[in-house]
Amino acid sequence: MAGEDHQWQGSILYNMLMSAKQRHAAPEAPEARLGDQCWGCSCGDEPGVGREGLLGGRNVALLYRCCFCGKDHPRQGSILYSMLTSAKQTYAAPKAPEARLGPCWGCSCGSDPGVGREGLPGGRPVALLYRCCFCGEDHPRQGSILYSLLTSAKQTHVAPAAPEARPGGAWWDRSYFAQRPGGKEGLPGRRAMALLYRCCFCGEDQPQQGSTLYSMPTSTNQTPAAPEERPGAPWWDTSCGALRPVALKNPQVVCEAASAGLLKTLRFVKYLPCFQVLPLDQQLVLVRNCWAPLLMLELAQDHLQFETVEVSEPSMLQKILTTRRRETGGTEPLPVPTLQPHLAPPAEARKVPSASQVQAIKCFLSKCWSLNISTKEYAYLKGTVLFNPDVPGLQCVKYIQGLQWGTQQILSEHIRMTHRGHHDRFIELNSALFLLRFINANVIAELFFRPIIGTVSMDDMMLEMLCTKL
């Protein structure tokens, strides 16, 4: 039999049977090869090792025939084994990515470190990785762009920390009376909630209390808070709320006193020797431009006091009905007037003075009364106002300029002789003249003369008074 076995050792059947028996036997471990690396698999990287832990301490090496080199290699070094083990790694928990020095331009992974989700059983952190669409690398969810968008959208419903106080910015990025950036108090647990809004000017997030839209009324049912007490605004400031229309409380008495003051003013101007030498057209130019401040000085000298009452302007319907009646020739009845019908012109032709404009007149009168100006000082001040070389349309500018300079010199000499502190007195008188710049001539005409002269122009009345003997 031994010879027969030796005879069949080289046959194909013998080789198949012997290879089948090797599965149940414990073959010896393959010897380590010195070189001869296999290029078709990874057997050259890892040495062939056996499976330990069987009964008797025998090692079993599962060999596979390499499809490239034709040699037997252990299972750990085959290509199929490497593919299967690498595929299983996708289901395992990956390690947290190491911190990179260079920031990723496609997401915010460079800003926030890669952290995992805490709070799972056992306290094990789990990092959910997402493939970045820009850099092609895996980043934790906290560092992705989508996560940043979602978390920023959720901040409007949660209570974020109050923003830090920033240095005062430019005036256009917030309202003037902006409150301090803070949260909404009164929530359960005394938690502060700051509602942030993106500023359309500076592009930064600012609290709602500091924005310009917050200052506007947000609801019709909202009760306005008591305004803070601010320093008193000057009478020429139009933001103080004194734009309501007013009228004289006693128009007949005040208008007669104002007309008498205008008559005395024109008589004083007309009979000045230096004024009489001027041509009539030059006289008319000076009077038309200086009658209002001259009248204010005369009313201050006469100590004219008056009171005003607030009136309501005619409605749009009343203006339409009045205009329609004038066009149709008076066939329709007149609407109910708000002022004296025999003194006031039509509603669309009137410009009712406002409270701030009347307050400017009273301020000038009070200033003059506080200085106790004498009769001569009033006369010199009137001469200074009358001979104004800056009046447009004036031809004899040098002559008028010389008259004004001479009047100032006479006033200064008079003050030096009658007052010790003549420099201060001269400055105070000129400061009173400076207040005349804030008084409009049309306001004086509407307030004191419109109820009497009606639609007659003040320029025509000045011409008539200059040509007639007063």
Curated annotation (Swiss-Prot):
Subcellular location: Nucleus; Cytoplasm
Motif (AF-2 motif): 461-466
GO biological process, one term: adrenal gland development
Sequence repeat copies, ranges: 1-67, 68-133, 134-200, 201-253
Keywords: Cytoplasm, Nucleus, Receptor, Repeat, Repressor, Transcription, Transcription regulation
Gene Ontology MF terms in the entry: DNA hairpin binding; nuclear receptor binding; protein domain specific binding; protein homodimerization activity; RNA binding; transcription corepressor activity
Residue intervals of the NR LBD domain: 205-469
Pfam family, any one: NR_Repeat
SUPFAM superfamilies: Nuclear receptor ligand-binding domain (SSF48508)
Ranges for region 4 X 67 AA tandem repeats: 1-253
Chain positions of motif LXXLL motif 2: 80-84
The organism's place on the tree of life at top rank: Eukaryota
GO CC terms in record: cytoplasm; membrane; nucleoplasm; nucleus; ribosome
InterPro entries: NHR-like_dom_sf, NR0B1/2, Nucl_hrmn_rcpt_lig-bd, Nuclear_hrmn_rcpt, Nuclear_receptor_repeat
Major localization class: nucleus
PROSITE patterns, sorted: NR_LBD (PS51843)
Chain location of the short sequence motif LXXLL motif 1 per the record: 13-17
Motif (LXXLL motif 3): 146-150
The protein's assembly and partners: Homodimer. Interacts with NR5A1, NR5A2, NR0B2 and with COPS2. Interacts with ESRRB; represses ESRRB activity at the GATA6 promoter.
Domain notes from UniProt: Homodimerization involved an interaction between amino and carboxy termini involving LXXLL motifs and steroid binding domain (AF-2 motif). Heterodimerizes with NR5A1 and NROB2 through its N-terminal LXXLL motifs.
Entry similarity comment: Belongs to the nuclear hormone receptor family. NR0 subfamily.
Role played: Nuclear receptor that lacks a DNA-binding domain and acts as a corepressor that inhibits the transcriptional activity of other nuclear receptors through heterodimeric interactions. Component of a cascade required for the development of the hypothalamic-pituitary-adrenal-gonadal axis. May also have a role in the development of the embryo and in the maintenance of embryonic stem cell pluripotency.
PANTHER family: NUCLEAR RECEPTOR SUBFAMILY 0 GROUP B, NUCLEAR RECEPTOR SUBFAMILY 0 GROUP B MEMBER 1
The name this protein goes by in its record: Nuclear receptor subfamily 0 group B member 1
